[in-house]
Amino acid sequence: MAAFSGCASPLSTTLRSGLAPFTLRHRLRLRRLRASAATLREVCAGRVPEHVLQRAEEVGYVVPTEVQEQSLPVLLSGQDCILHAQTGSGKTLAYLLSVFSAIDFGRSSVQALVVVPTRELGMQVTKVARILAAKACTVMALLDGGMLRRQKSWVKAEPPAIIVATVASLCQMIEKRAFSLQSMRVLVIDEVDFIFGSSKQVSSLRKILTSYSAASSRQTIFASASIPQHNRFVHDCVQHKWTKTDVVHVHVNPVQPMPSHLQHKYAICSKKERLHVLLSLLEKDAPKSGIIFVAEQSEKSKKAGHPPSTTVVVEFLRTTYMGSLEVLLLEEDMNFNARATSFTEVKGKGFLLVSTDIASRGFDLPQTSHIYNFDLPKTAIDYLHRAGRTGREPFSKLACSVTTLITEDEHFVLQRFQNELKFHCEELPVESMFAFNL
């Protein structure tokens, strides 16, 4: 199921301003394309360079996903677009194909920016972009503050066609006049709701959207699995001049944001019992690979000198877990090299990754069969993104599960998540299922 809305939407203020709606002609064109197109090549219809399409086919991108079928006609026409579809649906490939269709491979200038909220997501986007580019153009990653001085000289000497950057690194380079955005044709903001929801990043993002370049001179693409109050967001995009007035909202699967094949479970236990319950779950489930999500350490806890919960969980599992999976740590306070090492180590083999929510956005670890919420997510959207790390292609047909550990007082919060995201959560009877004495 897919829904399309132009910026005109139901808002009367938008209609009065004379903004163009997403017309019937566009809808019919998309329907015809969906009915007839069998391959990604046919969807792209000659608007993506041949060498990029060939490379995409070589690595397995042959049949388009639903979001690619629905969005590529809009993206490849050069229109501003809000890509709104669940995690693992193919948004990254969709916007990268649009980027490659827009840039001039023979020109030495920055022509496309992809802005990401985390370095890990940036690493993944950069990898896909470089695979597709196949050395036909330069793709530079600005993801680590410690490397920016060296990269500043590189980007001045030979400007890359595409830059993938975190908000902070990008703003730092722009303010140092490391490169010009005069030639920029495409601006992509990935996980846009996450960046707008981050007090550390939102002001810098607004600068990127309005101060450093103008919406009228570029194609703007927003991507996310979750955009709360999306009609309002579309209106704000136009009102604040983040996009042009004919921005198109492509919303795939709006009714069922949670992948339907996932099993959701929960166990009620005290916080003191939580580590042992987690251990018993791991022994019982025997996951192929798993991610254990733990809450960020509070400032109060830091000031008190307490170790982060991630460290506590990792140390506990390394001394008690007897399974074959390697226990690894990933958290925001780790330096770039340590985080990159952890991310590289989990690729292609069995693992238990203990992480904060940094791993919930854009992480592509398809072998993940089990998610464990050691701490309850703050919002339903956070639950959705954590759950989206499992059940991904080509493993989506496997029995994948999300298990949340909660106290009695947190039960109502989990029920609220179920109502909002429309999924059912089965209770695990802790006392009868686990062998240890609680």
UniProtKB/Swiss-Prot annotation:
SMART domains on file: DEXDc (SM00487), HELICc (SM00490)
UniProt EC number: 3.6.4.13
Subcellular location: Plastid, Chloroplast
Highest taxon above the source species: Eukaryota
Domain Helicase ATP-binding: 72-245
Locus of motif Q motif: 41-69
Record comment regarding domains: The Q motif is unique to and characteristic of the DEAD box family of RNA helicases and controls ATP binding and hydrolysis.
Protein name, entry field: DEAD-box ATP-dependent RNA helicase 58, chloroplastic
Annotated source species: Oryza sativa subsp. japonica (Rice)
